[in-house]
Design a protein with these regions (language model features):
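Thiamine diphosphate
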Residues: 1-211
Length: 212
């Protein structure tokens, strides 16, 4: 039912990954940007559990607005999804200018939107490193989120900067690992949403039970 609602609307707040009355909205459009955004939310909530984040997924957009051609999001629905005043970090699978141009259809302060997307930066490299080069990786998004929460006073500024430096270090660590091994760190591909971790563990235990 929820999947059908998203197909009809073209965008949806993912309640299972969201808090009420958010301090920050993290949005994504596209499979890989969505995975990186979800991983970034996991990172931020791990370190800043009191920070309230809304997760928005966009599955369809048009030149005249977010949503589908049959059901373009009007201003009221746009504000309901993205709020009318909170900062938004938007991870996109295409050029950032595409999303920026769509925002012109709405009465919105575009400066509160931090839009990430393809910059034509990178060549033959690993999938995650391509995200890093385009600043669309989970670590880049988490850094942006920490700093935004620090600017807004949700997290102490010094703490936000410290957390940002930790994840810049994670980026550097993975870059060094790629140079030595030609692949990303195993933890990158191994990530799953927290609610799924117990399911994975249960499946593994069941498998071992059958083979022992």
């Amino acid at each position: 039912e929820l999947a059908r609602q998203q197909v009809d609307a073209g965008l949806m707040v993912w309640d299972f990954a969201s808090d009420e009355y958010p301090d920050l909205v993290m949005a994504a459009c596209g499979d890989y940007p969505t995975k990186e955004t979800m991983a970034a939310i996991d990172i931020v909530k791990t370190h800043c559990p009191n920070a309230k984040i809304r997760c928005v997924n966009v599955s369809s957009l048009t030149t005249v607005g977010f949503g589908t051609l049959r059901r373009v999001a009007d201003q009221k629905f746009f504000d309901k999804v993205f709020t009318d005043d909170k900062p938004v970090i938007f991870n996109f699978h295409g050029y950032p200018q595409t999303v920026k141009s769509i925002l012109f259809n709405y009465a919105v302060d575009s400066t509160r939107f931090d839009i990430r997307g393809y910059k034509e930066i990178g060549s033959t490299t690993t999938p995650f490193d391509m995200h890093v080069r385009n600043e669309t990786s989970r670590y880049d998004l988490a850094i942006a989120a920490f700093r935004q929460l620090g600017r807004n006073g949700v997290v102490p500024f010094e703490e936000a900067e410290h957390l940002a430096s930790i994840y810049q270090g994670k980026i550097d660590e993975n870059t060094a690992y790629i140079k030595a091994n030609g692949v990303d760190l195993p933890e990158i591909d191994a990530w799953v949403w927290p609610a799924a971790r117990g399911l994975d563990e249960a499946k593994e235990e069941a498998w071992h039970g059958q083979t022992n």
